[in-house]
Amino acid sequence: MNGDEVRARASELPAEPGVYQFVARDPDGTADGERVLYVGKAVDIRDRVRSYGDPRSERIAGMVARADDVTVAVTDTETQALLLEANLVKRHQPRYNVRLKDDKSYPLVQVTSHREAPRIEVTRDPDPGAAAFGPYTDKGDVETVVKAVRSVYGLRGCSEHKYRDRERPCLDYEMGLCAAPCTGAISEREYREAVESATRFFEGETGALADPLRREMAAAAQAEAFERAANLRDRLAVVEGFHEGGGAAVAAGDADAGASTDVLGVAVEGDAATVARLHAEGGQLVERDQHRLEAPQGEDRVAAVLAAFLVQYYAERDLPERILLPEPHGDDEVAAWLDAADVAVGVPGAGREARLVELALKNAHRRAGGGDELGALADALGVRRPERIEGVDVSHAQGREVVGSNVCFVDGSAETADYRRKKLDEENDDYANMRRLVGWRAERAVDGRDDRPDPDVLLVDGGRGQLDAALDAVEAAGWDGPDAVIALAKDEEVVVTPDRTYDWGSDAPQLHVLQRVRDEAHRFAVAYHRTLRDDVTTALDGITGVGPELRARLLGRFGSVAGVRQASVKDLRDVAGVGEATAETIAKRL
């Protein structure tokens, strides 16, 4: 690549955090022999890659000259980019990356596989069979959190040698950092429960550690032990912010972290679809790629794309042990094939696995979006360039468990932090439901109760009737935020505005960005509806050993009853609180 080619390629890239790779391909132009020459991270990928158009060193100039293309993977935060860069450099060992001699990796937290009393510790080299969480970028925060876990749940941190030879409790027990399982001061069952509670924190359940710390802090303040209360307050601040930096979102990081895992995201635009695949090994994200295929026509296009991709892609490749999807693929034959191959398929509804799926979706949407879609949309609608687009959709089953979704895209990419959802009154009236949902958004904006900026475009999932209902709600609330309120009908793929209907071609870039927003609003609404529906009454109800808390944990892990049904007995056992007998019972009943 020369300087002009690099700058031209940079203009096509997102101005977002992420990782970029300079790659060289075979002389025939295929990617079969693709070699990664250099891996870098950036807060703004577009700006960083543009700088390579005028390299300042001979070494980098030589790298650019050997490169044929630049590929990227977007992330939500700079921390994610930092960790992904480290993983990719380790994976590919690019020629032009400077390697540190000691090659230290980022710290992880491991809970060992010791049968009676697992140990928790910070490590860079987890033991085989251990549950590993991370990696994390701030070792100080990790050590603070592990100390908090030990003080709350009494997990041991000693070596196996010291544990075996201990006859009486050590100093950690006296300091309140260990429950002394070595001397039987705590029963094996109670210790196991403590391990499960601690594990839930590292799986993303912040309250599992924050809540007991908060109670300890309140008790210390009540007893006027103000120095201890202050120390607990500082520790609580680290715990509450531990999962917010996004550092661990590039890791599989659950009890099955050692399994090879593929995470798929889908974006459909016109007659084509993009599938982004993220691959994790040993709990760390080490590979990502994108694939284009023809999008089937019909109602559930994303599900159809997933089913087609699973068959086409894995027919010629080794299957991973686990596959995470944004929604069920809905194909019984594909499900039977994967089940026979002992592949666990899940649709995560919450936690770190759900964030991995969101990251795959973000990469799929970014790959799908080509050219200046927002500029084309502005020209087509006669409005200013819409930097912020919000989409709304309603999901229900014959008027029951009615829910609304409100998603947000900024500069053409999903802004998941600004997603909202709303449980609506039960009524089997699509127009009335849309009026309530948009009214809720509009009234909160007018009253100042919604801290999000107003959208430039508000997109309604539906046709003329849904649009009129949305416009009624906007007018009734006196909301003048959006420059345009429009609708996108599913079947006809036509854009409806107050004045006219647009029937753009399937290759129109302005249609593609609206389709991505519409499809994401639909997915988010359906996911919430599924959660509520399963919460009201599920096939899990009445199963011996499955109470409300365990039911919620199962649904959170697998996304839905369908996800639980597809899980193997081994996958079920990996959920905290599910033993061998309960797992067998669940599998048999479902």
From Swiss-Prot:
Coiled-coil annotated spans: none
A biological process term (GO) from this entry: DNA damage response
Domain of life assignment: Archaea
Gene3D superfamilies: 5' to 3' exonuclease, C-terminal subdomain, GIY-YIG endonuclease, UvrC, RNAse H endonuclease domain
Annotated ranges, domain UVR: 207-242
Entry-linked SUPFAM superfamilies: C-terminal UvrC-binding domain of UvrB, GIY-YIG endonuclease, RuvA domain 2-like
Recorded GO CC terms: cytoplasm; excinuclease repair complex
GIY-YIG domain residues: 15-98
CDD domains: GIY-YIG_UvrC_Cho
Main localization of the protein described in the UniProt heading: cytoplasm
Cross-referenced InterPro entries: GIY-YIG_endonuc, GIY-YIG_endonuc_sf, GIY-YIG_UvrC_Cho, Hlx-hairpin-Hlx_DNA-bd_motif, RuvA_2-like, UVR_dom, UVR_dom_sf, UvrABC_protein_C
Subcellular compartments: Cytoplasm
Entry keyword set: Cytoplasm, DNA damage, DNA excision, DNA repair, Excision nuclease, SOS response
Any one GO molecular-function label of the UniProt entry: excinuclease ABC activity
Reported function: The UvrABC repair system catalyzes the recognition and processing of DNA lesions. UvrC both incises the 5' and 3' sides of the lesion. The N-terminal half is responsible for the 3' incision and the C-terminal half is responsible for the 5' incision.
HAMAP family in the cross-refs: UvrC (MF_00203)
Family named by the database record: Belongs to the UvrC family.
Subunit structure: Interacts with UvrB in an incision complex.
Identification of the protein by name: UvrABC system protein C
Taxonomic placement: Archaea, Methanobacteriati, Methanobacteriota, Stenosarchaea group, Halobacteria
Name of the gene this protein is made from: uvrC
